[in-house]
């Protein structure tokens, strides 16, 4: 979509979102109920930015959206979920995109966003995506193990691989920056979290069968 025509700085940030059916060949040993499956629906967005300032602003907006969605679902930050700043490993160039300066800058930017929000978070090394660091919203399952519900990620790789550029106000081509965000995450996974959270007794508006009339 982005490459369908030349893009101006006036069009950025550009938010492209979809609810898509995806398939992932997860190993059988890690498949877990609705939490980790091979076929799932993902609410995903790619936000294309012109500069670091736009990226930080979009990350803040994405976290606001995630907090709003969580509140609507009846989830409370600090009690039902928490933020994790997922960092890369500069020494592992086979696993992570190799650009130490970019990693340092992006991780610092995400850390600043979390600090400016005055919210509690923890940092986890070697938990980033191969293409960049991320902020993960972690929820604890009934077995006490944490898993990721929502996420906001920096992506160093996509702009380079697809040669994504825009025309700045001086008429010069410049590379874009990309943020991934998922507002409600994987539908199957959040359904599993909510079923555990409410012990199967979902709120009326969320229950698939809201009222049943039984003859006596």
Annotate each predicted stretch with a short phrase.
Residues 1-216:
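NTP/phosphate- and nucleic-acid-binding module
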């Amino acid at each position: 979509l982005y490459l369908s025509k030349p893009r101006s700085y006036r069009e950025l940030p550009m938010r492209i979102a979809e609810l898509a059916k995806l398939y992932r060949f997860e190993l059988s040993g890690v498949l877990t109920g609705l939490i980790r499956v091979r076929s799932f629906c993902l609410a995903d967005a790619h936000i294309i930015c012109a500069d670091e300032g736009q990226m930080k602003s979009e990350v803040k907006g994405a976290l606001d959206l995630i907090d709003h969605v969580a509140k609507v679902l009846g989830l409370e930050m600090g009690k039902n979920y928490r933020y994790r700043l997922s960092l890369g490993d500069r020494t592992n160039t086979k696993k992570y995109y190799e650009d130490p300066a970019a990693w340092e800058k992006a991780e610092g930017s995400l850390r600043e966003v979390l600090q400016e929000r005055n919210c509690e978070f923890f940092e986890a090394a070697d938990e980033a995506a191969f293409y960049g660091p991320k902020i993960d919203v972690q929820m604890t399952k009934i077995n006490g193990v944490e898993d990721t519900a929502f996420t906001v990620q920096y992506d160093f790789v996509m702009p380079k691989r697809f040669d994504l550029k825009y025309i700045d106000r001086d008429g010069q081509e410049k590379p874009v920056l990309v943020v991934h965000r998922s507002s409600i995450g994987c539908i199957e996974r959040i359904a599993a979290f909510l079923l555990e959270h409410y012990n199967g007794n979902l709120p009326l508006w969320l229950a698939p069968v809201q009222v049943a009339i039984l003859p006596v």
